[in-house]
Amino acid sequence: MTLAPGRRLGRLALSAAACVALGVVQRDIALERPIDAAVQTSNSASSDALEVLAVRPPNVFMIAGAGGNIAVQIGEDGVVVVDAGSTASAPAVLAAIKRISPKPIRYIIDTGPDADHVGGNEALSKAGDTFFPGTRPAGPRPDPTRAVATILAAEGVALHMSASGSASTGSPAGLPTDTFHYARKYLYLNGEPIEVLHQPAAHTDSDVFAFFRRSDVVVAGDILDTRHFPVIDSERGGSIDGEIAALNRLAELAVPSVPIVSREAGTIVIPGHGRLCDHFDVIEYRDMITIVRDRVRDLVTSGRSLEQVKAAAPAAGYAGRYGNAGGDWTTDQFVEAVYRSLAKEKP
């Protein structure tokens, strides 16, 4: 039976993977135990519950509930973590990672500069161990005897996190120690290639996808957020057209399970927040944003003011699913971000 687009990975998460309590994350359980009743566990380090989900057992896992979603890849070389969660959740995240694998954390890959993704950088890095003895904690007085895990990110992440950047979202010891400004950075760890793909001017100017090629898992960061309309952070270089371009790239990377439709096959996409996704979920999200963008563009072209654009309700038909009347990112804020992004392009 073919599932409706937008619900495929919701079902997959309930049938193909295992969500287990932090105290019992074991490879055999991850492979055999169904996730029909997801188990959440609280811990003394955080009042929030964490969920550990086996995305591609026995190699790729996801930790939810620590701020942004966290991906964990394990193997003989050690542990690779994509995003580190919030500062407050770091002790609980470390405990979860240790129960997934006793190997040291080797790399932390930041998908962007937001505090709920990079806040745990310092704690996770200091708990890890690099392949390169010369790598030391950042900051004015690093411990010269202590090696740490490498923090890899696009160059803009370090700028936004530092005091000299446009926003300060982390301590000096949590700053990236390995940055790049080109389109693609790659690693080969735990038996598979890992591509880190820069997506300029999307959610911010320093977003990346982390693509685990053999596992066929893409970590999308906040370019894809299934909870609401995407956050277009224009102050940090984000734009609506860059967001759509990044989603087009993500749709190209995420191969659907065709012609044989299977809930167990196809590329899995880990969003910045929310449930696991697949190719069709990305397409649905991209199409929704494109339609709203085109509606706003027509209004901008006709000379409408921001208030007139908001009154025209260009997100109608989608606000019920992705909208928010209050909170951190409202429908009005999204429409305003799209308007301001397009107004910059207007001749």
Stretch-by-stretch model annotation:
Residues 51-99, 208-221:
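Conserved beta-strand hairpin/beta-sheet module of binuclear metal-dependent hydrolase folds
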Residues 76-80, 87-141, 147-149:
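Active-site metal-binding motif and surrounding structural segment of the metallo-beta-lactamase
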Residues 14-15, 19-77:
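Zn-dependent metallo-beta-lactamase
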Residues 2-14:
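Bacterial N-terminal signal peptides that target proteins for export
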Residues 23-29, 33-41, 130, 256-266, ...:
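Accessory terminal helices/loops
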Residues 78-79, 86-88, 143-199, 204-205, 213-214, 246, ...:
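Metallo-beta-lactamase
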Residues 59, 73, 83, 97, ...:
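Divalent metal-coordination and catalytic microenvironments
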